[in-house]
Amino acid sequence: MVLVPKYLNFESDLAESVTNSMDSSLPDETTSDSIILTTFNDFSNWARLSSLWPLLYGTSCCFIEFASLIGSRFDFDRYGLVPRSSPRQADLIITAGTVTMKMAPSLVRLYEQMPEPKYVIAMGACTITGGMFSTDSYSTVRGVDKLIPVDIYLPGCPPKPEAIIDAIIKLRKGVAREVHERKDKLRQTRRYFTLNHQLEIVPIIHTGKYDEHLFSKFSEISIEPKLNVSPQRIEKSKSSISSQISF
């Protein structure tokens, strides 16, 4: 590669050229400039990052934000994304929404049917950690990375379409720097892939016993009538009411 900037020599006041010590990228000087020299790995990465085909997988409100990308306002076709309905034709799955225990085997089956190399974007708080269902829900998976490996985490409730585009751009940058042999080493070796979250452990508050002190206070209070009404007066009022109803 040759750089030809100009500078002035203060002694001779003449313009001279500066040539760096790097060799030319062309094999020889007769090679045309229209030839591009690259490696097969770089060419494969360029082709894959320019044509990511996502699998439509939405189970909650996050998918509404993802569906807005298809419209003309955001137009994610400019990034080469073509939505597919079959996992065998997709290389990207965006899990948008809550993943339940009943849906977990189906999600794993869809991921296994996708051809290699394949990528996963976890979209939304419900997909990443379970969201608002992570405290006391018996049927929610606390993170989709317990089922399949995740490449990009996209937090939000729900994330905006601009955030989804930013996640896709970051995934494209990761694909551009990827080495095929390195991706094979990271392939899932067991059915349920588990990752430990870096979250702070807090004491359990939903134990069902946090209202016992309130119930004990109410049980100690004795309710006594403040009006001293004789039983004869009560019977007299009942008879008068019944006589009025009969008329």
From Swiss-Prot:
Needed cofactors: [4Fe-4S] cluster
Q: Which InterPro entries match?
A: NADH_UbQ_OxRdtase-like_20kDa, NADH_UQ_OxRdtase_20Kd_su
Name the reaction it catalyses: a plastoquinone + NADH + (n+1) H(+)(in) = a plastoquinol + NAD(+) + n H(+)(out); a plastoquinone + NADPH + (n+1) H(+)(in) = a plastoquinol + NADP(+) + n H(+)(out)
How would you describe this protein's topology in the membrane?
A: Peripheral membrane protein
Q: Which UniProt keywords apply?
A: 4Fe-4S, Chloroplast, Iron, Iron-sulfur, Membrane, Metal-binding, NAD, NADP, Plastid, Plastoquinone, Quinone, Thylakoid, Translocase, Transport
One MF term in GO for this entry? Answer: iron ion binding
Give any Gene Ontology cellular component. Answer: respiratory chain complex I
Where is [4Fe-4S] cluster annotated to bind?
C61, C62, C126, C157
EC code(s) of this entry: 7.1.1.-
Q: What class of enzyme is it?
A: translocase
- A single GO BP: electron transport coupled proton transport
Principal subcellular localisation of the protein: plastid
TM region positions: none
Query: Known Pfam families for this protein?
Result: Oxidored_q6 (PF01058)
Q: How is the cofactor bound?
A: Binds 1 [4Fe-4S] cluster.
Localization, per the record, is: Plastid, Chloroplast thylakoid membrane
What domain of life? Eukaryota
The record's function comment reads:
NDH shuttles electrons from NAD(P)H:plastoquinone, via FMN and iron-sulfur (Fe-S) centers, to quinones in the photosynthetic chain and possibly in a chloroplast respiratory chain. The immediate electron acceptor for the enzyme in this species is believed to be plastoquinone. Couples the redox reaction to proton translocation, and thus conserves the redox energy in a proton gradient.
Q: Which PANTHER family match?
A: NADH DEHYDROGENASE (PTHR11995), NADH DEHYDROGENASE [UBIQUINONE] IRON-SULFUR PROTEIN 7, MITOCHONDRIAL (PTHR11995:SF14)
Task: Give the family per the record.
Answer: Belongs to the complex I 20 kDa subunit family.
Q: HAMAP family, per this entry? A: NDH1_NuoB
Q: How does it assemble?
A: NDH is composed of at least 16 different subunits, 5 of which are encoded in the nucleus.
What is the recorded name of this protein?
Answer: NAD(P)H-quinone oxidoreductase subunit K, chloroplastic
Q: Which organism is it from?
A: Anthoceros angustus (Hornwort)
